[in-house]
Amino acid sequence: MKYMENNNTSHSKHPFIIGVTGGTASGKTTVCDEIMKRLENKRIAIICLDSFYRPLSKEDRETVASYNFDHPDAFDWSLVENALRDLKDGKDIEIPTYCFKSHSRLEETVGLGDVDVILFEGILSFYTQSLREQMDIKIFVDTDSDTRLSRRVMRDIAERGRSLEGVLYQYEKFVKPAFDDYILPTKKHADVIIPRGADNVVAIDLIVQHISSKLSEKESFRKSQGQLNVNGGSNTASSVNHA
């Protein structure tokens, strides 16, 4: 999870939630980073769906090479749905920490609350209706399959110590079928589609303008409600005094 704080702004307990999805290595995280960078005067957190993987059983760990991490069953949907719902309701939450080496959920969690914007990203961020209902805007990062494959190969070899053969096997057996069967169909739920991912600066700028506008509207409404409460309180006090 990434977090950026600015202490010079007032905050709302009901954050603006942005869902970001797309295929593996499509540039989801980079798009989120660019949005975060441009909204520098806000408190922002990036939550990754990867944090909500189910811990593998002993049997699954023994055959981890054939475990499908791109299938919906790999995620704890109840946990992630409750987390997003609580955030939307203005509650503080604890985000789990998933260890990719042991394929287990660690005891330590990451606390989160009182933010202006939540960027929730992952390959299946739009998978359930309950998740989609919590989102104020839904973004699909649309990058061609050749680019995604080349990025995945370079990333997994460099960062995860995998062989080229192993990466290609996993891609053909799990990653590509999961994209076709589960990820691509959620594209229809997107409010905004970003072709070419983070390279599409114009699209990201337009999205940030829209988000800034919506946040300004929320802030204006919050202030007006506060003013109404103050005025209402004054009127009540006045009537009591006259009595």
Swiss-Prot record:
Keyword S-adenosyl-L-methionine: no
Binding sites annotated in the UniProt record for ATP: 22-29
Origin: domain of life: Eukaryota
Listed GO biological process terms: CTP salvage; pyrimidine-containing compound salvage; UMP salvage
KW Nucleotide-binding (keyword) present: yes
Any one Gene Ontology molecular-function term assigned to this protein's record: cytidine kinase activity
Gene: udkB
Class of the enzyme per the UniProt entry, highest EC level: transferase
Catalytic reaction equation(s): uridine + ATP = UMP + ADP + H(+); cytidine + ATP = CMP + ADP + H(+)
GO cellular component annotations of the record: cytoplasm
Name this polypeptide is given: Uridine-cytidine kinase B
Protein family according to the UniProt entry: Belongs to the uridine kinase family.
Record lineage: Eukaryota, Amoebozoa, Evosea, Eumycetozoa, Dictyostelia
Organism annotation: Dictyostelium discoideum
Gene3D superfamilies per the UniProt record, alphabetical: P-loop containing nucleotide triphosphate hydrolases
Pfam families the UniProt entry points to: PRK
Listed pathway(s): Pyrimidine metabolism; CTP biosynthesis via salvage pathway; CTP from cytidine: step 1/3; Pyrimidine metabolism; UMP biosynthesis via salvage pathway; UMP from uridine: step 1/1
Entry keywords, A to Z: ATP-binding, Kinase, Nucleotide-binding, Transferase
Classification via InterPro entries: P-loop_NTPase, PRK/URK, Uridine_kinase-like
EC number: 2.7.1.48
Protein function: Catalyzes the conversion of uridine into uridine monophosphate and cytidine into cytidine monophosphate in the pyrimidine salvage pathway.
